Amino acid sequence: MRVDVVLRYVGVVMIFIALFMLLSAGISYVSGMDSAFYPLLLSSLLTALLGAFPLIFVERTEQITNKEGFCVVVGSWLVACVVGTFPYLIWGGEFSLVNAWFESVSGFTTTGSTILNDVEALPRGLQFWRFSTTWVGGMGVVMFALLILPSLGRNKLTLSNVELSTLAKDNYRYRTQIIVQILLVVYVGLTVVSTLLLKMAGMNWFDSLCHAMSACATSGFSTKNASVAYFNSPMIDTILIFAMATAGIHFGLIYATVTGKRSNIFRSEVTRWYLGMLFAGGLLITVSLYAADIYPAFTSAFRHGLFQFVSVVTTTGFATADSNQWTSFAVILLIFGSIVCACAGSTAGGIKTNRLVLAMKMMRTRLRQQQHPNAIIRIRLDGVIQETEALHSVMIFIVAYLMLILAGTVFGTIFGVDLMTSFSGAVASIGNVGPGFGEVGSMDNFSALPGVFKLSNSLLMLLGRLEIFGFIQLFFIKWWR
């Protein structure tokens, strides 16, 4: 494998990230040259210089292997997280080395967890940088880099095995460059529409843009310590529910529906399961909250119950209430939603509705085969017959996913973190959800937790964002031969 070629492509990603740092510095300058201006400007120059070295000294090549392409994807994520710490470390404040790494990984993986006790105390430029990391991460660092790497788009690089933000392997099969165009149109369009709607609902331009970027990236970063609860607006909640739910749908399906290539978005079996789960889960939580008299009005219970459930299923992590104070039944449903999550081909993390549907179909098929041993039963998803290898991959992924949650839980308890915090933190981190329960609840943060716990959860974030095996494979020596 040609490491220099991989470094060249990763270098382009670094330069692209440097542009967002420069844009954040511009926001800082417009805001009166706040204390983040020079840290952001210096970080931009440093990142651009580091990215320029391989571009200058490594000759451009038109062909790369699948293994090299794989390393471009994983390497871009890791490097993005590393250089993403620069503005935090140079600015200082609450950002120690561990805290800066955690915040950067949380942003680029669109997890949305934070170590900040007072988000509102951040300079506006640094605030915008946090949202830039999550917005870039939502689409995928590599996807953005492909916009300026047309040569890479002509190669047979299978991103859908590694890069979670690309279109899933189903009946939407496009060349890489067309995938980028589809993702960009849907992503930017949804962000713009959400920004305008939030502004009309009463937010200022900065808050509306930042929350739209966060919602469309299914991240959950907020400009306020109390998250969306700060605004206390049913209209804003409704707009964000729409944005989050839409961002959790397969982007290729959204594009096909909007352009008329597909007549009805509800024709997708996975989408029906996903939207049905959102409504059913939100309604069950509503009934639980109303019956427990946590909210005396049914409309208030429905507003908060639906919002929180949509927020965790789409792995966004916004909050309109402190779910630590809710019923045990509501907590169980929220944890279930944090594990299952939204559709493949979206910006969400987690196991994905697609895999859940296939797992249930496999169980049903197994029961039918016990009744009819000689029957040949095909499993279909959205009309496409699923190969045996693909079905095995689904079950292996689910088992690995649950084992990592268990490992993260045990690891946290070893270092003195209580069971609920360890478990929900592991679920929220590997699913890129953000908030959990206990000390990492929807109105809390990771600041008071041990540094080793923050590092283990940042590792879970990367594992979840890179589909587990995409990251683990790098540590097998035979793979590099």
List PLM regions with ranges.
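Membrane-proximal intracellular helices of multi-pass ion channels
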Residues: 1-481
